[in-house]
């Protein structure tokens, strides 16, 4: 499943949603995966975009990846940095685990060993 920079959400190479917020350099894309209910919600600069998308429940592995020619991609799983740049606003996080640029959606926490047992 992926959120493309032109505002499309694709799953298994099939459009799930189109006409959503597009993005370019400097955009922060947030991903909230709910593996109890098998859904994912995307966020653009802290605001949800589109509807939640259903995930396949059984026998799938999910991993983060990004790609675009001649582009640099940085991930923050709660350490408070994108590469060597610290987040500027440190949004709230109900679990107190992780530092993010924007507020973490209710019921979600950092993808880390500390957040697995909540």
Where are these regions (language model features)?
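PRY/SPRY (B30.2) beta-sandwich protein-interaction domains
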Residues: 1-118
């Amino acid at each position: 499943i992926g959120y493309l920079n032109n505002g499309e959400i694709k799953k298994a190479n099939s459009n799930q949603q189109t006409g959503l917020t597009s993005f370019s350099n400097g955009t922060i894309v947030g991903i909230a995966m709910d593996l109890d209910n098998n859904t994912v919600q995307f966020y653009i600069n802290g605001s949800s975009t589109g509807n939640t998308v259903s995930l396949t429940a059984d026998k799938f592995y999910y991993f983060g990846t990004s790609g675009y020619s001649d582009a640099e991609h940085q991930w923050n799983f709660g350490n408070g940095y994108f590469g060597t740049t610290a987040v500027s606003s440190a949004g709230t996080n109900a679990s107190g685990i992780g530092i993010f640029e924007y507020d973490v959606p209710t019921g979600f926490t950092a993808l880390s060993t500390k957040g697995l047992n909540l």
